[in-house]
């Protein structure tokens, strides 16, 4: 979604929200949370407040009038009823054959609500220096996680990674072979964005940054001499990220055409740009996801930018056998998250079994 459209949608949601959600929005914007994250959270709050009104758990005539007392006095049973509503809602439509929302989607909804409740009960201060209320019912609502061993998850993910020589082979394919399959009209569009697209893919494969971190990169954040980029991690922490040397040529090629091809002026700070009717804009997450999916599907298998992050992490662990180094590269505060990569590259167990 283009940044301008995203901001418009955010303003639309803000216009119907209670004052304390607007306070929450301002607080998280200062962290800063990304606009994409805040947009998704506002969507979840709208859905939740709509349900409160439909379920007669508030007497407010509109969402903006739902008071803090309503949230404070919701019970665990109320929240469980909301979860059940999310899980079964589509099946209530006579014309729909869909199952309920996935557990992943439900968990995301509950995560958004947990963030709001934590703000209201712990983080915010009223005139007396106290939170708005103390009872956090979200702490009593459990989420169901998909049961899967690390080994099983690693095996599933491994099929969608570009390991070994495939990392550079993927870039070479986009650079030299992809165009051969295109019509003349499609070739024109491809050639216009070729350097940019290659630079994005190379950066993701060479640094392991999150999609949102790549989207929010500005020119000032990229140091090609040192091969370091500055990003805003989750939680608003600024971090310096090393970039593998193989990405340098692709990034330099893009920078050589960025200003001319995308009509960039001094005020256009975004590193990755798109151009529509002569107006440059920051390239959005959705466009990058589609671009990565398009090229990867033609090369081997359709993947997301997050799988390119997994690719870098796996290759880095394979080369160093250091979970600490990998966790630092990815911006994680502990090595627990990187346990997955030890399973992806762990061939010792298989070799031992083969020798029995």
Curated annotation (Swiss-Prot):
Q: What is the originating organism of this protein?
A: Streptococcus pyogenes serotype M28 (strain MGAS6180)
Q: What SUPFAM superfamilies is this protein classified in?
A: DNA breaking-rejoining enzymes
Under Gene3D superfamilies, the record lists:
1.10.150.130, Intergrase catalytic core
Domain of life, source organism: Bacteria
Entry-linked InterPro entries: CB, DNA_brk_join_enz, Integrase-like_cat_sf, Integrase_catalytic, Integrase_recombinase_N, Integrase_SAM-like_N, Recomb_XerS, Tyrosine_recombinase_XerCD
Q: Which Pfam families match?
A: Phage_int_SAM_1, Phage_integrase
Task: Kindly list the GO CC terms recorded for this protein.
Answer: cytoplasm
User: What PROSITE patterns does UniProt report for this protein, alphabetically?
Assistant: CB, TYR_RECOMBINASE
Q: What PANTHER family does the record tag this protein with? A: PHAGE INTEGRASE-RELATED, TYROSINE RECOMBINASE XERC
- The record places the active site at 210, 234, 306, 309, 332, 341 (o-(3'-phospho-dna)-tyrosine intermediate)
GO biological process terms held by the UniProt record: cell division; chromosome segregation; DNA recombination
Does the keyword section mention rRNA-binding? Answer: no
Q: Which residues form the Tyr recombinase domain?
A: 169-354
The molecular function terms of the Gene Ontology recorded here are:
DNA binding; tyrosine-based site-specific recombinase activity
From the Swiss-Prot or TrEMBL record, state where the protein is found: Cytoplasm
> Where are the annotated coiled coils located?
none
Where is this chain primarily localised? cytoplasm
- Know the name of this protein? Tyrosine recombinase XerS
Record domain Core-binding (CB): where = 16-121
């Amino acid at each position: 979604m283009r940044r301008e459209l995203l901001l418009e949608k955010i303003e639309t949601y803000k216009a119907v929200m209670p004052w304390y959600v607007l306070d929450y929005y301002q607080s998280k914007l200062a962290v800063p949370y990304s606009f994409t994250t805040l947009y998704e959270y506002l969507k979840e709050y709208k859905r939740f407040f709509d349900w409160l009104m439909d379920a007669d758990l508030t007497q407010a005539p509109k969402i903006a009038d739902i008071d803090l007392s309503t949230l404070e006095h919701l019970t665990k049973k109320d929240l469980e009823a909301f979860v059940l509503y999310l899980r079964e809602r589509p099946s209530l439509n006579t014309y729909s054959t869909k199952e309920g929302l996935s557990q992943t989607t439900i968990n995301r909804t509950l995560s958004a609500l947990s963030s709001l409740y934590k703000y209201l009960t712990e983080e915010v201060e009223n005139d007396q220096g106290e939170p708005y209320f103390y009872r956090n019912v979200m702490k009593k609502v459990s989420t169901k996680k998909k049961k899967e061993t690390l080994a099983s998850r690693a095996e599933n993910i491994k099929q969608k990674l570009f390991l070994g020589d495939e990392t550079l082979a993927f870039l070479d394919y986009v650079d030299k072979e992809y165009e051969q399959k295109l019509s003349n009209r499609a070739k024109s569009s491809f050639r216009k964005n070729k350097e940019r697209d290659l630079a994005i893919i190379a950066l993701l494969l060479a640094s392991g940054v999150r999609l949102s971190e790549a989207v929010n990169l500005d020119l000032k954040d990229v140091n090609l001499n040192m091969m370091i980029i500055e990003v805003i991690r989750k939680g608003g922490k600024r971090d310096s990220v090393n970039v593998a040397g193989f990405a340098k040529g692709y990034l330099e090629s893009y920078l050589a055409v960025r200003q001319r091809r995308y009509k960039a002026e001094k005020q256009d700070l975004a590193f990755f740009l798109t151009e529509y009717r002569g107006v440059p804009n920051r390239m959005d997450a959705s466009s990058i996801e589609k671009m990565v999916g398009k090229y990867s599907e033609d090369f081997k298998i359709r993947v997301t930018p997050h799988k390119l992050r997994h690719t870098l992490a796996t290759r880095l662990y394979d080369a160093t056998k250091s979970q600490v180094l990998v966790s630092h590269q990815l911006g994680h505060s502990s090595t627990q998250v990187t346990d997955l990569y030890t399973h992806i590259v762990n061939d010792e167990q298989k070799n031992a079994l083969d020798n029995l």
